Each structure stands twice: as structure tokens, then as C-alpha cells.
A protein has these predicted regions:
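A short, surface-exposed loop/turn module that caps and links secondary-structure elements
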Residues: 28-58
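Short, surface-exposed coil-to-beta transition loops
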Residues: 60-64
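Amphipathic alpha-helical transducer elements in NTP-driven molecular machines
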Residues: 20-23, 59, 94
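Short polar/acidic secondary-structure junctions
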Residues: 54-56, 67-70
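N-terminal targeting/export leaders
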Residues: 12, 23-29, 37-40, 99
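Enriched for short, Lys/Arg-rich terminal
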Residues: 68-106
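Arg/Lys-rich, positively charged N-terminal/basic patches that mediate binding to nucleic acids
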Residues: 1-21
């Protein structure tokens, strides 16, 4: 069983992008495939997964940054954003995510 730990920022934004039903499908998929996302370079193991929304393909969908702690049965959902609004994650945000994940894994 996987427990999802949602950051305050993720919780604030998720319903701007996904319906409850879409979010449920996303969680089921991620629980079954926790290593599916690409590891973001310089993030300390944070992964980015592309997820399509209803009526859009992956390129018009959202990106979710997450950290999988499979040995602890946890997936940390950190950030969700539209592909159209952000080309890449700024370095200072990646650094903050890396520091947070280092703290979590200790």
C-alpha cells in the first residue's frame, strides 16, 4: 500500500488542473508505477511525470514533481503545473526541493 504525502503547495494547486476523478486515476497509476517519471537532474531524486488532462494530450497536460520513498511506502507529491506555463524548473526551486528531500530521508 502506498501513502501519498501532499505538499501544501501541491494541495493548493492540484484542483486547478485535475478533477477529483482525474486525480484518483493519477494516484492509482503512480502507486503502481512509482519510478515512471524522469529523475530531475540536480534535485536529489525528485521525479517529473507528464500527465494528460481530459481533452489534451501529454504535451498539453500537466507536470507533477514527486519523490518516491518506495521502501517507506510513500510518494511525496510536491508540485503540479501546466506544461504551457513553465518551460523548466528554476535552479533555486530544485535546490530547495533537494534540501527538503534530504531532510525527509534522514
Amino acid at each position: 500500500m502506498v501513502t501519498f504525502v501532499e505538499s501544501p503547495l501541491f494541495m493548493k494547486q492540484v484542483h486547478d488542473y485535475l478533477t477529483d476523478a482525474e486525480y484518483g486515476v493519477f494516484q492509482e497509476y503512480l502507486a503502481a508505477n512509482p519510478d515512471m517519471g524522469d529523475v530531475v537532474r540536480g534535485s536529489g531524486g525528485v521525479r517529473k511525470i507528464r500527465w494528460s488532462r481530459r481533452g489534451t494530450g501529454k504535451s498539453g497536460g500537466v507536470r507533477v514533481l514527486y519523490f518516491a520513498r518506495t521502501e517507506a511506502g510513500q510518494i511525496w507529491l510536491l508540485l503540479i503545473y501546466a506544461k504551457s506555463s513553465v518551460d523548466s524548473i528554476p535552479g533555486h526551486i530544485l535546490k530547495a526541493l533537494k534540501e527538503e528531500m534530504e531532510h525527509v530521508t534522514k
